A protein has these predicted regions:
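An N-cap/entry alpha-helix motif that binds or orients negatively charged groups
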Residues: 1-43
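Alpha/beta enzyme core
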Residues: 2-3, 7, 13, 51-132
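Generic serine detector
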Residues: 20, 25, 30, 45-46, ...
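N-terminal cofactor/phosphate-binding cores enriched in small/glycine residues
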Residues: 27-69
Length: 132
């Protein structure tokens, strides 16, 4: 792994408005998230219970980003939130932890994804011990 030699935070960067000859239609803000998944805008929502459920994931997907449905609910409800997004034929992510209790969640969501030919499973690598 290459060591990070410099890092910036939001406070380190300031964007100053300035006149430009470049038109918005000439700008490409897309990002290749995976080999087969390209987003129109480089925006992924946080997989937090106060941030992303179906409504937010729909709004972000319509804008060209990716909403990631949080995992702080039972598996059935998480799949219901995913279905809300998929009903509108949009892409969506689903957060799944890495702890032993999360394997069942991953299996159920993977089965749903494979059965319904869906897009993406988003993994959060967080162990169960981080919450205890």
């Amino acid at each position: 792994m290459v060591p990070i030699t410099e890092a910036l935070t939001f406070d380190d960067v300031t964007l100053v408005p300035k006149y430009s000859e470049i038109l918005p239609s000439q700008v490409d803000t897309s990002i290749k998230l995976t080999k087969d998944l390209k987003l129109k805008i480089p925006l992924l929502s946080s997989a937090m219970d106060t941030v992303t459920e179906g409504k937010m994931a729909i709004a972000i997907a319509k804008a060209g980003g990716l909403g990631v449905i949080h995992r702080n609910m039972n598996i059935k409800n998480q799949i219901l939130e995913i279905k809300k997004v998929k009903k509108q034929k949009l892409i969506v992510g689903a957060a799944v932890g890495a702890g032993p209790s999360e394997f069942k969640r991953a299996e159920v969501i993977l089965k749903y994804v494979q059965t319904n030919n869906e897009d993406i499973l988003f993994l959060e690598f967080i162990s169960d011990t981080e919450y205890n």
